[in-house]
Every structure is written in C-alpha cells, then in structure tokens.
Design a protein with these regions (language model features):
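Non-catalytic cap/lid and distal C-terminal segments of serine-dependent acyl enzymes
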Residues: 1-376
Length: 376
C-alpha cells in the first residue's frame, strides 16, 4: 500500500482502535504485582500510543503532503530524475492516467474538465518529471475548439506531494468554481512538486554540476505543454503559483525569467534559498549566483522585470511577515520610480505555515493570477 493511500490510513486507524480495545480488556489481568505484569502494562501502553501516533502521522501526511512515498519518507529515493535522450524523436508529454474531477457532473469533461497524469521530458535540462494537468471544461467544448488557453504552473512546498494540490489545496476544484461563477477565465493548471531531482531540495536552482531545475521549469516545461495542449507559449500566457518553497520558486522564476512567466504568486514564500542538509551547496561556492537568487538583493541591484507579483503572509503565525512587508515596500518604491514590476499582497490577521492557511488564500490568489494572463 502506498504511503498516501486511503487503505493504509484506514488500516492504521483500525489497528489503533483494536489495540486500544485489547488493552482495556487485558488490563485487569495485568493488574498484579511483579515484573511480568508491569512489563505487560508498559508494553500495552507503548503499543497503543505507537499505533495511535502512526495513525495520526499517516493521516497528517496524507492531508498535508509531506512525503509522497515510502522511499521519500526513509530517504531512499535518490534517483536524480530521468535523463532524456536528445536524439530520440517524439512527444515531450506522455499521458499515463486520467481522472475525473470531484465535483457535480465530474464524469463529463465538458462539465467539469479532466485531470491527466503525465510525464514531462525536458530536452534542454535533461530532466523528466511527473505532473498532473487540469484541463477546464471549456477545453472540451466545441465552441472553444480553436481557442488557446493560458496556463499556470502550480508548485507544492518541499518535499510535498502533487496529490496534495488536488486533494488538499483543491486547485482544480477552486478553479472550476471560480470560472463557473464568472470570476476567472479558464486556466490549464500544471501541478507539480518543485522536487524534480529527489530527494534533493534544489530550490528551483540550476545547480552547478547538478540538476538544471530552473531550466526545466522555465524553458522545457512551457514548450512541452504548449506543444501537446492548446496552451500559449509566450510569457503573457503563463503564470506560476506555489506555497512555501514553491512560493519562493514562483517569485524567483518570474523575476529571473520574465520571458517565461508574466505573473507569479508566492503563498508564504521565503525570499532567498536556504542552505542546509536537504539542499547541499546549490551555488557551487559562487557568491554571485547566491546573490542573484536572493529576491531582496535582486530588487536592490538588478533591473526590475516587467512582471506582476503576489505575496502572502499573516500578521500573527507566519515567520515571513516582516520579510514580506519589506519585499512589498521595495517593489512599491520601484513603482514610484516608474519601474515595471507590480506587487499585490494577501495579509491575513492570523494563520500559520500550513494547508489551512493556504486554502484560505488560494481562491483569491488564483483569481488574481487568472486576471493577469492572456490567451493569445
């Protein structure tokens, strides 16, 4: 059973309940004095607590998407992505599965759209990675047959699971609801983890001598998707949104590559790449590369890109609040000088660095993003 499957969560919960019941039933028999009864009571208590802990842990992981598989959890997934043979012809997007959207009328693509699981190959970066692509119902309707749709890359945090974007943050369901209410134009959503070279947290950097993750997201992915689907290939057709690490990636890639993305939304983002055990040395010892991936430094020292940015935080509960205010103020000063970067924000009064907070922000952020992309 997979780490995020319903079956394993249910099995763990049932095991915890059964062991609790067995403990209650056997407790009178273990009430005597002596080494054996004491060890029996200790063993029953530890066993019950362990199964309850495991059940809650599995449920939390399924809900929040910390780890996507057993190999993720135990750190044994060390495949650095799939190397692409550049001389092999053929499509760069391969559909491996389709599924319905969990809304009314979800069995009909013309009513609810469709989610496709795909594998995206990057000929420039040499990386291949799985993704889920949400195609809105308009994509399947005859009157839209000649229309090109705008698209948004949607990123999780680290390590994250792509399924959490569907089942936890509910991006496709939210997009469907907003379009149906007339608050947003139809978008094609490309939902992914930023961890395309697991288990390493690359922070969407082209690591010297390592995986070229930034190249994959800014060059390979838009072209591959546009070649396979009716999606525009220009920057004005593409936006990017993400939470936590995915939020940093979103902002950075738009600021560094305005020719790829014209709008970016970072939910609870950081503003520079951390260097720790999960990242390793991302910049090959280069202080220049490290500075260029620091978003605050870029605002102070690099030309302002013609992009629209959205950031989010909470006055109480988020550690990035002060940095978010600094970032917003820096962009506002650029605006007053006539620079082309635009800034918007979502600031909650309270909210932690978690899915509950991001679910409150996703509808407004998605509506904002859809309003800044073009379909031609």
């Amino acid at each position: 059973m997979g780490l995020t499957s319903n079956n394993i969560v249910i099995a763990a919960a049932v095991a915890a309940l059964l062991l609790f019941a067995v403990t209650i039933w056997l407790w009178p028999r273990l009430a005597g004095r002596g080494v054996a009864p004491v060890l029996g009571r200790v063993g029953m208590l530890l066993g019950t607590q362990l199964t309850v802990f495991v059940a809650f842990g599995l449920f939390a992981n399924q809900s929040f998407g910390f780890y996507g598989s057993w190999s993720d959890l135990f750190g044994t997934q060390d495949e650095p992505g799939v190397v692409v043979d550049h001389d092999t012809p053929g499509t760069r997007v391969r559909v491996t599965e389709t599924r319905h959207l969990a809304v009314d009328g979800g069995s009909s693509p013309r009513v609810a759209g469709r989610i496709e699981k795909v594998n995206i190959q990057g000929p420039v970066s040499g990386i291949a990675s799985p993704a889920y692509i949400y195609l809105p119902p308009e994509y399947f309707r005859p009157e839209y047959a000649r229309r090109t749709f705008p698209a948004a890359l949607v990123l999780t945090g680290y390590p994250g699971t792509t399924e959490a974007l569907i089942n936890g943050l509910k991006y496709p369901q939210t997009s469907h609801r907003l379009v149906k209410a007339g608050r947003m134009q139809p978008l094609v959503l490309v939902m992914m983890r930023p961890t395309v070279a697991p288990p390493r947290d690359t922070e969407c950097v082209d690591v010297p001598g390592g995986p070229r993750v930034e190249t994959f997201f800014t060059q390979d992915l838009p072209k591959a998707v546009a070649d396979h689907y009716r999606v525009g290939e220009r920057a004005r057709n593409w936006g990017v949104i993400g939470n936590s690490t995915g939020g940093y990636c979103a902002l950075k890639m738009a600021m560094r590559h305005p020719d790829a993305f014209s709008a970016a939304a970072g939910l609870s983002p950081s503003y520079e790449a951390p260097i720790d055990a999960t990242t390793g040395d991302l910049f090959g010892g280069s202080e220049r590369l490290e500075r260029e991936n620091d978003l605050m430094w870029r605002l102070d020292h690099m030309p302002a890109p013609p992009v629209s940015l959205l950031v989010s935080s909470s006055e109480h509960g988020e550690r990035n609040y002060r940095d978010t205010v600094r970032f917003v103020n820096k962009v506002k000063r650029l605006n007053r000088r006539g620079e082309p970067t635009r800034i918007s924000s979502i600031i909650l009064s309270t909210g932690g660095h978690n899915f509950h907070t991001w679910k409150r922000e996703v509808p407004a952020a998605l509506e904002w993003l859809g309003g800044r992309l073009g379909d031609r």
